[in-house]
Design a protein with these regions (language model features):
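Outer-membrane beta-barrel porins/channels
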Residues: 1-281
């Protein structure tokens, strides 16, 4: 079996901001997101012992495509009581998506005489709406023009408020939404990081902890996610370049049968290298 996936999520912002006496800053934005996800799953069988007359192999392929557009609102504020201290908070509404799901299947059969036969299903389309969780963020940072900065951020995400709505044919997704409310809960996420300034060079490090989105009776399915990061950068006049590396570690337990007692454990490690360069003008 082979599974190929690809996708993208882009966002455009329309923002407005202001400040009072360079002590209190406030901003708001409208975000418009465009999402796309494609999946191709192929199952192949080959008859190697020649026990089936005139049959050699077949491929069964499933194609899926999810795409849509959504919008959200963000509101945030920063208070700077003294020059080196910043205290901030923000909220983000759910992102309200209008999505379309397309899928179809193909099957190819190959025979011993070299001939083949192919068949495809009709393309099926289903439209629906999705709202993502509400998010609240707060943070505090100590900054210095001489040595750099240290920051701490807290985020709360209410996964239980995710909802599916208004499917084609009057589908209301009541069982699915009941399952979301039963299985998912609120998660608390924590991030801490620092930047050390060494002339025109910058050294950075950070750590993040993301709680499981599952409620307590289901939280054995996924452990907390830990992310370690580090990097360095260089600044000169209007030019800058940054290098960063992050490693995420987490564990997931997936039911292999219908009961939660039958779980298979998978350990995940995700490494990312990021290089950024640019000019300011």
């Amino acid at each position: 079996n082979t599974i190929d996936t690809k996708g993208s999520l882009g966002e455009y912002f329309f923002s407005v901001a202001g400040n009072y006496a360079h002590k209190f800053y406030i901003g708001a934005s409208l975000g418009i997101q465009r999402i796309n996800y494609e999946l191709t799953r192929t199952h192949t069988e080959v008859e190697e012992d020649n026990n089936i007359y005139d049959f050699h192999s077949f491929d069964f392929t499933e194609y899926e495509d999810h795409s849509g557009t959504g919008f959200n609102f963000k509101l945030g504020a920063i208070y700077k009581p003294v020059e080196f201290l910043r205290i901030g908070a923000s909220v983000q509404t759910p992102t309200f998506f209008k999505l379309e799901y397309n899928w179809y299947n193909t099957m190819n059969s190959n025979f011993d005489d070299g001939s083949s036969y192919s068949a495809s299903s009709d393309i099926q389309t289903f439209s629906y709406r999705l709202s993502t969780p509400f998010r609240f963020n707060s943070g505090i940072a100590l900054t210095s023009q001489k040595w750099g900065m240290i920051s701490f951020d807290y985020e709360r995400v209410d996964y239980e408020f995710m909802q599916l709505k208004e499917g084609d044919g009057g589908v209301q997704f009541t069982p699915e939404n009941d399952s979301i409310s039963m299985v998912f809960g609120a998660a608390n996420n924590y991030r801490v990081g620092g930047e050390l300034k060494l002339g025109q060079f910058y050294v950075r490090g950070g750590f993040a902890l993301y709680e499981s989105p599952y409620k307590s009776r289901y939280d054995e399915r996924q452990s907390v996610r830990e992310i370690y990061s580090g990097g360095f950068g260089y600044r000169e006049n209007s030019f800058f370049v940054d290098f960063a590396f992050s490693r995420a570690l987490w564990q997931e337990k997936t039911p292999i049968f219908s009961t939660l007692s039958d779980l298979t454990t998978s350990d995940f490690t995700q490494n990312k290298f990021i290089i950024t360069a640019g000019f300011r003008f």
